[in-house]
Amino acid sequence: MSVTRVILLGALFGGGLAVGAAQDAELKPPPEDTLYTLPPVVVTATQARERSTPVTFSNLTARNIRERYSVQDIPVLLSELPSMTTTSENGNGIGYNYINLRGFDQRRLSIMINGVPQNDPEDHNVYWIDFPDLLASTDNIQVQRGAGSAFYGPPAIGGSINLVTNPFSATPSIMVESVLGIQEYGDSLKGRPLATRKVAVTVNSGIVGQRYLMYGRLGRITSDGYRVNSSVDLSSYFLGAMRIDRSMITRVHFFGGPIHDGLAYYGIPKWMGSDPHLRRSNWSDLSADSLAVSYTSRARRIALGSDTTYAVPRREEEVETFSQPHAELIHEWRISPRVTLHNTLFYYAGDGSFTYDASWADSAMLRIGTSYGFPAEENPRNALVQAFVGNRQVGWLPRVEIDHGDGDLTLGAELRFHRSTHWGKIAYAENLPEDFDPGYHFYEYNGVRDIVSLYAHEIHRLADGWNVMASLQLAYNRYGIRDEKYLGTTFSVPYLFLNPRVGVNVNATESLSAYLSVAYTSREPRMRNLYAAEDSWFGATPQFAADTSGGTVRYDFGSPLARPEHLLDVELGGRFTGRDAGLTLCLFWMDFRDELVRNGQVDIFGQPVTGNAGRTRHYGIEAEGIVTLAEGFTLGGNATVSRNRLVRYTVYDDGGSPVVLDGNPIAGFPDLLANLRLTYRNAWLTGSLVWKYVGAFPTDNTDDPRFRNDACRVWN
């Protein structure tokens, strides 16, 4: 997609208006006070630093973000970092997008904004679409790989990502931004329409009353999407205020935006990808004999030919509307030169629904009948289901940092409480009973999630360039379901984990350093692994040990079938930093017990179905480097070579016979990834040529070459 951006800048000086470039400047409170700069929001215990912290990480700076961001979602911007891959539901990187890090999907990552957890407490997923245009207000992004030292949010299995927003400026300014994008479909039926539009207005107050700063940004992004009926309409806002006192800094952030998007969560068969028209297809459901189809000569026959069992096109009514405002209060108090107290309070409230095709559902599934108060003589036809979710989450993240001379000690805690309401109703159907109540909820339940953790983190400085890190986290969390309509399922499942981490960093010279870290991390399964209550109307049941004697099912809610994951992660790395070049190397060894792996199936919403594997292992090498080729020209890149294998994993076929998969590659994990970026930069212009390679990877665990995603290469 080609993008053109036009920016109008206005800097306000003494009530006049001059055209100029907005720039950051040092903030000078009253003359008798100390000189302040505008500090970013950094969670010190989780933010890694070169030559100090023994952690494998990469940073995207404010300049990187400004140069590369236009309209794309956060995962697309991050996709060039080491071991990172991105997928897009609607095909153009605007809408629902997902990140994989070292092959681990984003449910296994710990995602934070200003240190505040963003993973959904029940599903563990991250809905980047709920943060439209947030990158325009972001100052820094750090990605830690492996068992990242993120003490807030879910334990980091594959890694952690922290976005830091710091949009304030001491210089008053107004900026109006417009972006136009031309979509290349490769389909003669569509041509090259103007498919993406963005408009945004940014206001910085500068210094007000010698100690206050205010910031506001309003925007809107619209896109037709690449796939059929996959458009998005994303409004956004980010409002912030800061007060700086002699020993305190207080910030308030309020951000989010209502969204409206067409559903595109169901994928296409691999063999459709070679046809420029069919690969834009957006099906609600599809069944086909993909193994019998030639990828080229017969691809166009899928819509009409014998290779399709059935295909249900996505209906225009299948859309989502959602809004999740985020409110944060971030306070820093420097009690003494050696002691600083940090407190973060936050509140999220998300409400919305999506409407999807349920033409396959009968009266029994939709709970229509005499026993439900609606006598039905025939099944509904062409049903559309509206699924609603309402979330409320409040949290407090306190921590104290102590400089005790030989090191820095951080003590902190996390308290989060999440409550949710879920229900479904029939948005439309033919042949409904005459007295049918359109507000009738055929499923409904409330979710509960409580999270409490304590941690201690020490970076101890030894003699001559040696730093030792030791961390310990005690994490308690509890899942629960209450007030389930019709089935009456109620349970509460607690988890308690102790997550230690140790490491050492040594600075051999001014240019060369090395590190070693060892971490043990445990993580609970997500709610759907225990009970997909929103799917109970078409057959989902609680996944707990059950007693079926006497013909009645009695669940033991103290014995969930899905087990927590346990990871031992060892990272050995080195960094070289020169005047014109830099290089980082990392060897990693990740040994799992009970890893939740994909089994090759997807649910009705296109999401992978997972289950525990007894023992798995991931190991490999990562390299990241940059070199200045000539004045203005730089070449940067990274590569990952890894091996991801099932060590002990047995499944059972339909007849109940065991199938041993020991030694097979793990679904969803490519063994080879690479990125290159050639950049030219001067005072007025920045341009880049980008190449990305993603190696082939299996889509299930059988090691059958027919079930693989082919390797791909992309130039931008």
Give residue spans per PLM region:
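Short, acidic, small-residue-rich periplasmic hinge/interaction motif at the N-terminus
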Residues: D24-E67, Q106, C586
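Extracytoplasmic beta-strand/coil segments of soluble accessory domains associated
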Residues: P75-P117, D139
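Short acidic/polar hinge/loop motifs at secondary-structure boundaries
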Residues: P117-R145, W271-S274, R279
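A beta-strand signature from Gram-negative outer-membrane beta-barrel systems
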Residues: P132-E177
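Face-selective signature of the C-terminal outer-membrane beta-barrel domain
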Residues: T321-E484, N505-T509, F576, A581-W589, ...
